Amino acid sequence: MDSVRRTYTIMRGRHIDKRVPSKEFLSALDKAETAVRLPTGTGKDCGNPSWKRSLPHVLVASLTSLLFGYHLGVVNETLESISIDLGFSGNTIAEGLVVSTCLGGAFIGSLFSGLVADGVGRRRAFQLSALPMIVGASVSASTESLMGMLLGRFLVGIGMGIGPSVTALYVTEVSPAYVRGTYGSSTQIATCIGLLGSLFAGIPAKDNLGWWRICFWISTVPAAMLAVFMELCVESPQWLFKRGRAAEAEAVFEKLLGGSYVKAAMAELVKSDRGDDADSAKLSELLFGRSFRVVFIGSTLFALQQLSGINAVFYFSSTVFKKAGVPSASANICVGVCNLLGSTVAVVLMDKLGRKVLLIGSFAGMAVSLGLQAIAYTSLPSPFGTLFLSVGGMLLFVLSFATGAGPVPSLLLSEICPGRLRATALAVCLAVHWVINFFVGLLFLRMLEQLGSVLLNAIFGFFCVVAVIFVQKNVVETKGKSLQEIEISLLSSTQ
């Protein structure tokens, strides 16, 4: 371990690395790493660290995803009673604002998520994301006006904007390589559980006008749990290493991986950090530097994810099912169950089939299901056929989304981003996600009225086909590779 520490000192000392001859430096580093490479197998027999050490930390971080899913769906069943109680019933613009204001707040939160995560660390960033979600949900639950509701939703959105970025960072950085995909997918399961929970919680709102307030109060409990339990979790070793706290990073690796894997993990960090400036990442490096390709892939994936229309399904599925003559409560629960089922499949397959295969299959399945829904709203099928194709197509759409297009983009981006730029790159890409999400939420009902279901589904389906082509041509496979191996491979290919 001493050789790794010496190499670390050379690299991280202020400007010392600029005076070290390149060949001498690389030779010293290679000698330090010769006997401490991380295993790349897929099980215990291959010498991998136990996944049980990191699991509790991932579960606590997943509370952010649970809150994300809950707030994503909390207005689905309750929007009608909220509009009646607060006096804007029938105003589609106001109803759209209740949804999209949250997304506007999420955009603001995502813009600053990288600065927060790099500035105060991942653990404190989680706690800072919980605070506006607690305050915002409390404001929404107790308000008597539309403006109060919008303020509360905006504050919740800020927390939602910070949370997913930090979750993707943290889970990626504390997970062993051989289960990183599984853990990344498990956060999507937490999102599904939160979404399904919001749908169940909202069922009484149909008969109890004031029940929607209880639905908002419920969300303060997991937010408070996140803030408290994060005190018991470890900090990201990558963040500690970047801050010059190598000894603490070693201690964290020992907790996460076990003592016999600390040397290998530290050597990998040193290798990925060699030659990099220790200063904080700059936005210009992402937009004009050698990491632009990473940001381009991530931003495009998030954009296509939203342009597929998935969140329009979650926000307004009650309205869509009502038009099809299906009881919204039971249909929405079916949506939540399909989402959970697809996410479970993703957990099983993520580290077996890989990210790229799941993305292609997911977007292809979504395109097919949108085609079925478009046919349902033509004059071709019988009334029963219309019901079967519209509802069945929507459920297939959600199932397909949850197997790849849902969990993969944030996981993939957190894997392919260079360590020093990871938080900033995620913030930029998630900002793109929230901007498009905002406009989809704001304009979906109006577009449904003016364009009709057939044309709208055709537009969403077109973007799914574009996504299949884009993934095939641009996305690299990261299954089973350490973060440092991925980073070195990508950066060397762009030089």
Swiss-Prot record:
This protein's UniProt keywords: Chloroplast, Membrane, Plastid, Sugar transport, Transmembrane, Transmembrane helix, Transport
Domain of life where this protein originates: Eukaryota
SUPFAM superfamilies found in the cross-reference section: MFS general substrate transporter
Compartmental location: Plastid, Chloroplast membrane
Alphabetized Gene3D superfamilies for the sequence: MFS general substrate transporter like domains (1.20.1250.20)
Membrane topology reported for the UniProt record: Multi-pass membrane protein
Chief localisation class: plastid
Pfam families: Sugar_tr
GO cellular component: chloroplast membrane; endosome; Golgi apparatus; trans-Golgi network
GO MF annotation, one: transmembrane transporter activity
Transmembrane segments annotated in the record for this chain: 55-75, 97-117, 131-151, 154-174, 183-203, 214-234, 294-314, 330-350, 357-377, 384-404, 425-445, 451-471
Protein role: May be involved in the efflux of glucose towards the cytosol.
Protein family according to the UniProt entry: Belongs to the major facilitator superfamily. Sugar transporter (TC 2.A.1.1) family.
Name this protein carries in UniProt: Probable plastidic glucose transporter 3
Lineage: Eukaryota, Viridiplantae, Streptophyta, Embryophyta, Tracheophyta
